[in-house]
């Protein structure tokens, strides 16, 4: 099994610790884990040039950074996004990377194998609930077609890993073991979700109409995949 992990921060703090603990329960010795640390491994800020939409993702100014991450996600059964809770949201570095993935949304040029993957979003905070952060990251994966995204949150009551209490450490480990079991179970039985199928059919209808499909690049993609006809990405 292959796992892609995208860290929304460069430092190895509490959120990083959570992810590593989950991986200890989730990954087997022969599994392949590819990790990307932002901003180091990510692109510079998206400038909204629309090149990825209109011309192709390979022409994006940040393609040399974006496409290796995309390739890893494509080859993985499980995709993990983690980010500390920054002002009730994902880090700016993570959001910037998600901006570069916009062309892969179901509205544009989704890829078939994303409909069979499993996602996990992870966030921690010192006090305020980080639920919005994990939901926001999960939304990004779902719009790329990922049918099931699990969410892991932890209110650490600490500023860094050295000040986290033993009680919180135990809570972290217990929650990590539980969610790793769920993720592994789903990864062994991948299938598209009803919501994902509904979204697909909504935008299939749009791409089927030359008048409604405003971007020829997107429409050509749907035609090439056979989705305008009888082919479906989850089969």
PLM regions and their residue ranges:
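Helix-loop-strand module that forms the ligand-binding subsite of alpha/beta enzymes
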Residues: 61-147, 218, 222-233
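A generic structural motif
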Residues: 28-34, 146-147
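N-terminal beta1-alpha1 ligand-phosphate binding loop
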Residues: 2-31
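Glycine-rich phosphate/pyrophosphate-binding loop and the adjoining helix
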Residues: 147-235
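Residue-level recognition of beta-strand->loop/alpha-helix junctions
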Residues: 7, 37, 152-153
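A structural signal for isolated positions on well-ordered beta-strands in alpha/beta enzyme cores
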Residues: 2-4, 34, 120, 150
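N-terminal beta-loop-helix "entrance" segment that forms/cooperates
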Residues: 38-58, 160-165
């Amino acid at each position: 099994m292959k796992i892609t992990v995208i860290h929304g921060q460069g430092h190895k703090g509490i959120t990083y610790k959570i992810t590593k603990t989950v991986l200890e329960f989730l990954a087997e010795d022969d599994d392949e884990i590819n990790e990307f640390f932002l901003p180091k491994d990510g692109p510079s800020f998206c400038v909204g040039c629309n090149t990825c939409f209109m011309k192709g993702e390979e022409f994006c100014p940040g393609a040399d950074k974006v496409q290796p991450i995309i390739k890893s996600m494509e080859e993985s059964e499980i995709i993990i996004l983690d980010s500390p809770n920054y002002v009730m949201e994902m880090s700016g570095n993570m959001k910037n990377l998600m901006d570069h993935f916009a062309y892969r949304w179901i509205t544009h040029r989704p890829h078939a194998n994303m409909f069979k993957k499993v996602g996990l979003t992870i966030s921690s905070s010192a006090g305020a609930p980080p639920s919005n952060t994990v939901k926001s990251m999960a939304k990004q994966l779902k719009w790329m077609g990922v049918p099931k995204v699990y969410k892991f949150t932890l209110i650490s009551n600490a500023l860094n890993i050295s000040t986290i209490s033993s009680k919180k450490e135990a809570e972290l480990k217990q929650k990590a073991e539980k969610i790793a079991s769920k993720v592994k179970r789903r990864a062994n039985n991948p299938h598209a979700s009803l919501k994902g199928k509904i979204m697909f059919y909504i935008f299939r209808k749009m791409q089927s109409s030359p008048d409604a499909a405003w971007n020829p690049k997107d429409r050509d993609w749907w035609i090439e995949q056979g989705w305008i006809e009888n082919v479906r990405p989850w089969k």
